[in-house]
Amino acid sequence: MNWRGKKVLVTGAGGFIGSHLTERLVELGGDTRALVHYNALGTWGWLDESPVRNEIEVVAGDVSDRDSMLKAMDGRGIVFHLAALIGIPYSYHAPASYIRTNVEGTLNVLQAARENNLEMVVHTSTSEVYGTARYVPIDEEHRLQGQSPYSASKIGADKIAEAFHLSYQLPVVTVRPFNTFGPRQSF
């Protein structure tokens, strides 16, 4: 795909995968807006040290806030939705936070995309939705298993994305990365 001049939004742009994607879209000529989670320090996560920092339009907001999403998507054509609470262990202590960000946040992204007539939503899920492998290699027919509040929240987000595609014909693609690693990863 030719990204030159494409108006894209990346949610979760300050994180591990989101920061790399944001940089690559800029390198490919995309008109890239990056949504980073608001914080009192005004930092942009991994984008603070990005070599293309000055070529990115950064907006602070929160996917769990509908108005943030409507503003962030204004004038965009494609959204890459990577914003999420991650980390399985903490999800056992704060499951409501995971539902709020991962499920309700995804709902806000999808509703804003629909209201702004976006061309496409690329929704980022996780291999964790499959739980313990029932067979290998795992494929898309593998049963979904919510083995933690985190994985259950991502299953919920995936199903809402699917519903928006089937109910409203919103062009949605769901990707489920496995074992991502590299510079900037969290440990």
Per-segment meaning from a language model:
Residues 1-183:
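N-terminal Rossmann-like NAD(P)+-binding domain of SDR-like oxidoreductases, especially those catalyzing
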Residues 187:
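ATP-dependent carboxylate-amine ligase catalytic core
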